[in-house]
Amino acid sequence: MRDLFAPWGLDVPERALREMTLDSRIAAAGDLFVAVVGHQTDGRRYIPQAIAQGVAAIVAEADGVAPDVSVAEIHGVPVIYLRNLNQHLSTLAGQFYHQPGAALRLVGVTGTNGKTTTTQLLAQWSQALGETSAVMGTVGNGLLGQVIPTENTTGSAVDIQHLLRNLVDQGATFAAMEVSSHGLIQDRVAALSFAAVVFTNLSRDHLDYHGNMTSYEAAKWLLFSTHQSEHKIINADDDVGRRWLSQLPQAVAVSMAGNVPKGWNGPWLSANKVIYHDNGASIAFDSSWGEGELESRLMGAFNVSNLLVALATLLVQGYPMAQLLAAAPHLQPVCGRMEVFNAPGKPTVVVDYAHTPDALEKALAAARLHCTGKLWCVFGCGGDRDKGKRPLMGGIAEQLADCVVVTDDNPRSEEPQAIVADILSGLLDAGRVQAIHGRAEAVTSAIMQAKEDDVVLIAGKGHEDYQLVGNRRLDYSDRVTVARLLGGQA
């Protein structure tokens, strides 16, 4: 324990520490309990409980209760008080778990959309070239093929270092991590050293937390301005990305639409030609590393963008282009992200996690590229979240799909009828839309009505296998519902 707090010049008693935890419910004998002041609760209230459970020591937020950097004792248990503990947590946890991030190649990916697919592509692609790869993010954490589901995109600063330590101990040599704006603002990845950091795009999301787009952009920018990274990869097709490139002359500029800045002197990768077909896309590109052609099984223009960004990220780190291109056709779409389900004589069904106006627009545009018949859209909006996006999403569905079915998503504590009414308020002609509250019923209805050459996009839940109604968590999966209707397995 002395080594852990040596940077603060504190004289603390020597104790052997077993684990480091923020959760008093699981704190046990020999642990270091961390008492931070969070958004919802003050962890210092749980110090007595942690002591009762036999923790070896406590580190707590000093603000308002103790001198800025000080040591006290409660019932024989040393309590180290540090001011702004949240800001130091990543460093402390890194020390505690012996700097696991330095033992593997760590890539951080941020942006509103595309984080999950890009991290999965990076992990799959690097593993195909001999790495033992892991992912950390929305779908879960763990080695590829052994991913355990998670609650938050970016865990606490302690969780992240602990997880990295476990991954290194399991043999991981490469990890691709989704980095959320919440995680950046709360310093959860502050002490990590990234081999590369990636920006996908920025659009309306999490405004219930950030308040406005300026704050949201500033949160994302932290990964490129205040965090340590060897390489920076920026999507130049995004307005914010292009603006950032002017401040990042050494970054890799990536575009699928000819948006690499004129006179760009840094590394770059740009698509020349993209052909969409039933089974994915063929992409011809040019770059600082030479030209090539990429065959992909993923759907939609934004997945072309995700692929190019992932490719550039691996090229700039020295992975050989020929091997990357040979592995590309074997890359799999992410579970519940533009995931395609087919059956003879049935419509093509695409399950996607799109739950923002921008993501829904992109998902519909993507499905349209591969659609020869009518395009159907089944979606809803979550309760107790940004209400401003509901009419926007209704308008987008009406504009871009031929047939729309509005249904429930995760209503939470709100009345499902009120959420649907908000969505319908954004339509020019609500009479063109079917509203079916039961989600399984809505999905079934759309698939039964659709013809063989139609495409049915089911948006909003993606990989989720539950539905939040009131305070209940019900078993429900779009993927399982679709697979049953098409006579297959999800």
From Swiss-Prot:
A motif (Meso-diaminopimelate recognition motif) lies at residues 409-412. GO terms for molecular function: ATP binding; magnesium ion binding; UDP-N-acetylmuramoylalanyl-D-glutamate-2,6-diaminopimelate ligase activity. Meso-2,6-diaminopimelate binds at R385, D409, N410, P411, R412, G460, E464. Belongs to the MurCDEF family. MurE subfamily. It is found in: Cytoplasm. It is an enzyme of class 6 (ligase). The gene is murE. Carboxylation is probably crucial for Mg(2+) binding and, consequently, for the gamma-phosphate positioning of ATP. Its cofactor is Mg(2+). It comes from Yersinia pestis. It catalyses: UDP-N-acetyl-alpha-D-muramoyl-L-alanyl-D-glutamate + meso-2,6-diaminopimelate + ATP = UDP-N-acetyl-alpha-D-muramoyl-L-alanyl-gamma-D-glutamyl-meso-2,6-diaminopimelate + ADP + phosphate + H(+). ATP binds at G111, T112, N113, G114, K115, T116, T117. The modification N6-carboxylysine is found at K220. SUPFAM superfamilies: MurD-like peptide ligases, catalytic domain (SSF53623), MurD-like peptide ligases, peptide-binding domain (SSF53244), MurE/MurF N-terminal domain (SSF63418). One of its GO terms (cellular component) is cytoplasm. Catalyzes the addition of meso-diaminopimelic acid to the nucleotide precursor UDP-N-acetylmuramoyl-L-alanyl-D-glutamate (UMAG) in the biosynthesis of bacterial cell-wall peptidoglycan. It comes from the Bacteria. InterPro entries: Mur-like_cat_sf, Mur_ligase_C, Mur_ligase_C_dom_sf, Mur_ligase_cen, Mur_ligase_N, MurE/MurF_N, UDP-N-AcMur-Glu-dNH2Pim_ligase. Keywords: ATP-binding, Cell cycle, Cell division, Cell shape, Cell wall biogenesis/degradation, Cytoplasm, Ligase, Magnesium, Nucleotide-binding, Peptidoglycan synthesis. Pathway: Cell wall biogenesis; peptidoglycan biosynthesis. The lineage of its organism: Bacteria, Pseudomonadati, Pseudomonadota, Gammaproteobacteria, Enterobacterales. GO terms for biological process: cell division; cell wall organization; peptidoglycan biosynthetic process; regulation of cell shape. UDP-N-acetyl-alpha-D-muramoyl-L-alanyl-D-glutamate binds at L22, S24, H39, Q40, T41, N152, T153, T154, S180, Q186, R188. Its main location: cytoplasm. This is UDP-N-acetylmuramoyl-L-alanyl-D-glutamate--2,6-diaminopimelate ligase. Its EC number is 6.3.2.13.
